[in-house]
């Protein structure tokens, strides 16, 4: 009896020997060469319809004392691996659309659907803890009955969610974009909040709208409603600062001249 995983072929190699059924006195033999199975799909007890080059090889017993009679092969389901990723979204779902199957036979594809589960919603790398929600179906050249997800390696990564910061301040003759001026945080999940510290920079100190902020020493910190800085990143976010004109009060001074004139030249 030979045994192997499904590989899309009818190969029945001696190297896949599982057992002999009539060896005497505890003797052992091995098997070399290769024959041809009657079909290539998953099943037990498939007849090796052509012995081909299969041959008995001496073990603790002499091959010359035995002859190779009927031979069968058990073809087991091929174990699939999977991997995937998503951006942090505060849940433990790993949707089929974010998962890629691997270890398929070359030229075969499968469809898959449903939702798996990971052990934590937070950003990080995980082994998928529950695959029961994922099902596989026939695809291009691939039959689902020849494959299984059970026993494979299934990894999933939750990436940090990019967050953007924006705000306004009055002109102050600097290119600083301090955290306290960047009070709007975009792309947070649900009601989660974050805190911000440090100072970024803008390219010009002058008045203008939606100036791009370089991150500099700006840093995220844990906020409220479950907002954890470790689940977010400033990298990839859109960061903008609007610099508004600073209101000025002017004081003029002159001697009485009998008029209501308030000339700029009398600025004090």
Region locations from a protein language model:
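Short loop/turn motifs that initiate or flank beta-strands
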Residues: 1-268
